[in-house]
């Protein structure tokens, strides 16, 4: 008799996705981040659900309800900090996952890649609206500054901003709708992640060499389930260390001050995982130009498959491209640092140079390196 997991309609789907899935035998730990993102998503939905049971999305009580969660709810402080730091872990895994895709040419699976870009945008939207909910100073002013960027859109900008606010400023209506968005978006992310996996399993996984591995596949279970469990344990260990020892390390002290529309914080900045984009936004001394650069800094990922000039898929055997890739990583770290600094002399020019280098690397230098490496193959 055939095993039930191969015959039952539901079990069969799970079996084909996580048990008998043919997987390249040589994928490295960089391929762990997909499953870690799944783990982060489940964890965020669960902690978020318990927080939503005690949170009130109203300007007069939101800040107090978060304080109430931390003080009066059993292990409320733990759930709250798991959720806040879980978002940071989510973005660390997300950026590592995208970096892996860029390095090894996984973007050549275009449907999977495009759904991935859509997932990134949705996760960023979720994190942004979520940051507004505690209704601290940085929540309020972050929401004001970022939503206000839409007013740069010609003709409809101002109307659009007031429509999103639900009034003439960030107020009760804004907070209520942001809570609604923050609740629904993770479920949309879950659905998109399922489609992401569906498209991936149409082609099978890429591998570090970028060479088709159809002749050398092994079953996902037990070989990669055990490897994923190790990754999951390391992720949980890091998250617990962060949550239990330094829960506020990645947060902003200003968010412990209740939102006050009459007092602007000295330095308005988003959470660390948006700082690179914020630095690109600030580096252009024009509102519309900055907004366009901000959008393009993320949407540029869609054009990556079209910018592939090399005959080789992966960067494994392409030293010039490797050098440029790690330069890009260093550039993004520089932008992240600049995004958190005040707008004054040395930082402004460094931010502008780093922003120019970001677009130059992706649009010009990397495709050129690919062409040069093609020439070198003939030597």
Swiss-Prot record:
Obligatory cofactor(s): heme b
Binding site for a ubiquinone: 201
Cofactor comment: Binds 2 heme b groups non-covalently.
Membrane topology: Multi-pass membrane protein
Disulfide bonds: none
GO biological process: mitochondrial electron transport, ubiquinol to cytochrome c
Sample GO molecular function, one term: metal ion binding
Pfam families (alphabetical): Cytochrom_B_C (PF00032), Cytochrome_B (PF00033)
Transmembrane segments: 33-53, 77-98, 113-133, 178-198, 226-246, 288-308, 320-340, 347-367
InterPro entries xrefs: Cyt_b/b6_C, Cyt_b/b6_C_sf, Cyt_b/b6_N, Cytb/b6-like_sf, Cytochrome_b, Cytochrome_b_C_euk/bac, Cytochrome_b_N_euk/bac, Di-haem_cyt_TM
UniProt cross-references to PROSITE patterns, sorted A to Z: CYTB_CTER (PS51003), CYTB_NTER (PS51002)
GO CC, one annotated term: respiratory chain complex III
Assigned keywords, A-Z: Electron transport, Heme, Iron, Membrane, Metal-binding, Mitochondrion, Mitochondrion inner membrane, Respiratory chain, Transmembrane, Transmembrane helix, Transport, Ubiquinone
Gene3D superfamilies named in the record: Cytochrome Bc1 Complex, Chain C
Residues reported to bind heme b b566: 97, 196
Family listed: Belongs to the cytochrome b family.
Function comment: Component of the ubiquinol-cytochrome c reductase complex (complex III or cytochrome b-c1 complex) that is part of the mitochondrial respiratory chain. The b-c1 complex mediates electron transfer from ubiquinol to cytochrome c. Contributes to the generation of a proton gradient across the mitochondrial membrane that is then used for ATP synthesis.
Quaternary context: The cytochrome bc1 complex contains 11 subunits: 3 respiratory subunits (MT-CYB, CYC1 and UQCRFS1), 2 core proteins (UQCRC1 and UQCRC2) and 6 low-molecular weight proteins (UQCRH/QCR6, UQCRB/QCR7, UQCRQ/QCR8, UQCR10/QCR9, UQCR11/QCR10 and a cleavage product of UQCRFS1). This cytochrome bc1 complex then forms a dimer.
Name of this chain's protein: Cytochrome b
UniProt source species: Delphinus capensis tropicalis
């Amino acid at each position: 008799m055939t095993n039930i997991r191969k015959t039952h309609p539901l079990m069969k789907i799970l079996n084909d996705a996580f048990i008998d899935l043919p997987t390249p035998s040589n994928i490295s730990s960089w391929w762990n981040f997909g499953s870690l993102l799944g783990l982060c998503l489940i964890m965020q939905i669960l902690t978020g659900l318990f927080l939503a049971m005690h949170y009130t999305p109203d300007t007069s009580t939101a800040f107090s309800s978060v304080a109430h969660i931390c003080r009066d709810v059993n292990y409320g402080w733990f759930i709250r900090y798991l959720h806040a730091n879980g978002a940071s872990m989510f973005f660390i895994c997300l950026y590592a996952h995208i970096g892996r895709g860029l390095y090894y040419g996984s973007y050549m699976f275009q449907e999977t890649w495009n759904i991935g870009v859509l997932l990134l945008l949705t996760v960023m939207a979720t994190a942004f609206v979520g940051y507004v909910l505690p209704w601290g100073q940085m929540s309020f002013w972050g929401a004001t500054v970022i939503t206000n960027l839409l007013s740069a859109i010609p003709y409809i900008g101002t109307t659009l901003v007031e429509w999103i606010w639900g009034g003439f400023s960030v107020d009760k209506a804004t907070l209520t709708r942001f809570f609604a968005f923050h609740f629904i978006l993770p479920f949309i992310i879950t659905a998109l992640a399922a489609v992401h996996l569906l498209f991936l399993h149409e082609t099978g996984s890429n591998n570090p060499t970028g060479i088709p591995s159809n002749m050398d596949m092994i079953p996902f279970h037990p070989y990669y389930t055990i490897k994923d469990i190790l990754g999951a344990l390391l992720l949980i260990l890091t998250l617990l260390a962060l949550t239990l020892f330094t829960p506020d390390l990645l947060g902003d002290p200003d968010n412990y001050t209740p939102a006050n529309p009459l007092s602007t914080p000295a330095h308005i900045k988003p959470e660390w995982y948006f700082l690179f984009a914020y630095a690109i936004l600030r580096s252009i001394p024009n509102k519309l130009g900055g907004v366009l650069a901000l959008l393009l800094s993320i949407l540029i990922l869609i054009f990556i498959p079209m910018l592939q000039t090399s005959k080789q898929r992966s960067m494994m055997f392409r030293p010039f491209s490797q050098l440029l890739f790690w330069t890009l990583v260093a550039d993004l770290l520089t932008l992240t640092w600049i995004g958190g600094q005040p707008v004054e002399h040395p930082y402004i020019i460094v931010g502008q140079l780093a922003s120019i280098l970001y677009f130059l690397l992706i649009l010009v230098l990397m495709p050129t390196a690919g062409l040069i490496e093609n020439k070198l193959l003939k030597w």
